[in-house]
Amino acid sequence: MMNISGPREGDFITIKSYKHDGSLHRTWRDTMVLKTSENALIGCNDHTLVTESDGRRWITREPALVYFHKHYWFNIVTMIRENGVSYYCNLASPAVLDKEALKYIDYDLDVKVFPNGEKRLLDVDEYEDHGNKWHYSADIDKILKHNVRVLVDWINNGKGPFSKEYVEIWYNRYLELSRQQ
């Protein structure tokens, strides 16, 4: 995911999601990079500007850690709220990072995890509609369904971003770097 001239800890990047047809779906400004490795990127944003494909703009309400991995067809947004931590997991292509932004294709399906641990698979109808409209291949469908199972396994077993330590470690690192800015 990274190259030598890529962003470093404390740098800010833009995140762009696209749809399968190549159209821009959504843009997040100003996500602080907390960690990069050959395979993954962890970042955080708080009250960042989001621009929708139709031009609407809004500001996020709470701090959110973001996790992208080059081998998995999902990304994970950890929302840190007063009533607890919740997760919004996008089924999406592995992200690529270039000089402009971190980019991925959003494949509509989402898994939401509530602070009480309840899980919900969202936007199944949207996935089916877009799959028909844009002709998602059988391979894409198989990959995404497999990655839903991987993601649920991570959730059930507290792996990676779903571990208790993840939020504490990475949100504290974000606060520390923010104080240095």
Swiss-Prot record:
Molecular functions (GO terms): magnesium ion binding; nucleoside diphosphate phosphatase activity; ribonucleoside triphosphate phosphatase activity
Top class in the EC scheme: hydrolase
Cited InterPro entries: DUF402, FomD-like_sf, Ntdp-like, SA1684
Annotated residues for binding of Mg(2+) 1: 90, 106, 110
Keyword line: Hydrolase, Magnesium, Metal-binding
Active site residues of this protein: 26 (proton donor)
Reaction catalysis annotation: a ribonucleoside 5'-triphosphate + H2O = a ribonucleoside 5'-diphosphate + phosphate + H(+); a ribonucleoside 5'-diphosphate + H2O = a ribonucleoside 5'-phosphate + phosphate + H(+)
Keyword Signal (UniProt): no
Pfam hit, one: DUF402
EC number(s) on file: 3.6.1.15, 3.6.1.6
HAMAP family, per the entry: Ntdp (MF_01568)
Function noted in UniProt: Has nucleoside phosphatase activity towards nucleoside triphosphates and nucleoside diphosphates.
NCBIfam families, per database record: PRK13662.1
This protein's name: Nucleoside triphosphate/diphosphate phosphatase
Lineage: Bacteria, Bacillati, Bacillota, Bacilli, Lactobacillales
